[in-house]
Amino acid sequence: MFINRWLFSTNHKDIGTLYLLFGAWAGMVGTALSLLIRAELGQPGTLLGDDQIYNVVVTAHAFVMIFFMVMPIMIGGFGNWLVPLMIGAPDMAFPRMNNMSFWLLPPSFLLLLASSMVEAGAGTGWTVYPPLAGNLAHAGASVDLTIFSLHLAGVSSILGAINFITTIINMKPPAMSQYQTPLFVWSVMITAVLLLLSLPVLAAGITMLLTDRNLNTTFFDPAGGGDPILYQHLFWFFGHPEVYILILPGFGMISHIVTYYSGKKEPFGYMGMVWAMMSIGFLGFIVWAHHMFTVGMDVDTRAYFTSATMIIAIPTGVKVFSWLATLHGGNIKWSPAMMWALGFIFLFTVGGLTGIVLANSSLDIVLHDTYYVVAHFHYVLSMGAVFAIMGGFVHWFPLFSGYTLNDTWAKIHFAIMFVGVNMTFFPQHFLGLSGMPRRSPDYPDAYTMWNTVSSMGSFISLTAVMLMVFIIWEALASKREVLTVDLTTTNLEWLNGCPPPYHTFEEPTYVNLK
């Protein structure tokens, strides 16, 4: 029974739960790696050993957080759980493929961990640029294992994307148009399209790298007429849509949370929100070379990528101001989920502003590969994606489990986390502006103060993570059942009770369109 339910599951709720548990576990691994990084940088001098091991930790931290924490939780966990419930579908379109998408991830994770256990590990950074990732600078199997890990994670995501697109287009009630689906459903569909279009390019790039390393091809080796810059173009054509893949489902969740706790029946500017997400998805594909301002492109190319990147700020601004307009005049309930959402809006905006700074090719020449870039993307990920995940988790926890969290503890957790992440990443802007380079385990004494502050902040965040584990334990141990849920008419996922029965919407859903 246990094996049939959890290994061979074809139920979107069980698979969603598996994704959430896997993502939480990977999140612990990723957090542990990040604390190793901050321990190393807490004071000048070396702690872990040589530069290679440090870079292996940095590389693994990135891969674990992106491919095994944020994506499985947001798309796999929340996506699987909520999309079928929100559109009144009995399950996903391809339930067995759904199970396969999940079970490709643990082997992928295993390959990534194996890559750091053999030879010297893959100390390439998550970008895996040749020639550093070639078979000369990285002899041995480490990079090859990392490439195979990425292949598996990529296949998993592509299959998941096909599944979500089919489900969302094909399994709505006949009377419901695409423009009547909730914003989270839209965000997952747009994310799935981005995955479907970008991952094959990554697969091509890393497969060419694999043959360069093992079969003596020269795709990225000038000695045989290749070009390492080609790899960068292929990687970033995936890598830039990827960062929007990481944040778009978060946008969807924040829209739901802000609307719900403002007591509104719909978000402000629904169509504007949809078009903004579609614009962000489209523009995400035509700005990739802003990661490459230092490789020597012509001034016209740089001018284009600078301008195109700045255009993304417009639909993003539409979203931020629509969230604020949703709050306006609402009957605001100060729940923990609302706090995460408000924290998201503020800190994501800060991260967006530093992004606008980095979009300027002339400034980026100076700031590229400094801690300013690290601070920028950690503001949008560590305080954007993670805050959205936390907000979504505390908001939908009663739906997933049938139990309520302790409100006071959840608010204390938010406060500690808020202080921790800001204390960790705000000083990194100063370090970057004074020229401290990324991916280096040691630094001149001049950078000591802000690094120490940053490392202290990381330990505050660790405290918050440990408190979160306690809060979840407390909720599951106390078993306070959910009494009522407000606004179920405009929040379809709550309609079947908390937790919903194993099978929902077994007969076609009746939709009364206003």
Swiss-Prot record:
Name the EC number(s): 7.1.1.9
- Provide the membrane-side ranges marked Mitochondrial matrix in the record: 1-11, 87-94, 171-182, 262-269, 328-335, 401-406, 479-514
Localization, per the record, is:
Mitochondrion inner membrane
> Which key words are in the record?
Calcium, Copper, Electron transport, Heme, Iron, Magnesium, Membrane, Metal-binding, Mitochondrion, Mitochondrion inner membrane, Respiratory chain, Sodium, Translocase, Transmembrane, Transmembrane helix, Transport
**Chief location category:** mitochondrion
Can you cite a GO biological process for this protein? mitochondrial electron transport, cytochrome c to oxygen
Q: Which reaction does it catalyse?
A: 4 Fe(II)-[cytochrome c] + O2 + 8 H(+)(in) = 4 Fe(III)-[cytochrome c] + 2 H2O + 4 H(+)(out)
This protein is called Cytochrome c oxidase subunit 1
According to its UniProt entry, this protein's organism is Bos mutus grunniens
Lineage of origin: Eukaryota, Metazoa, Chordata, Craniata, Vertebrata
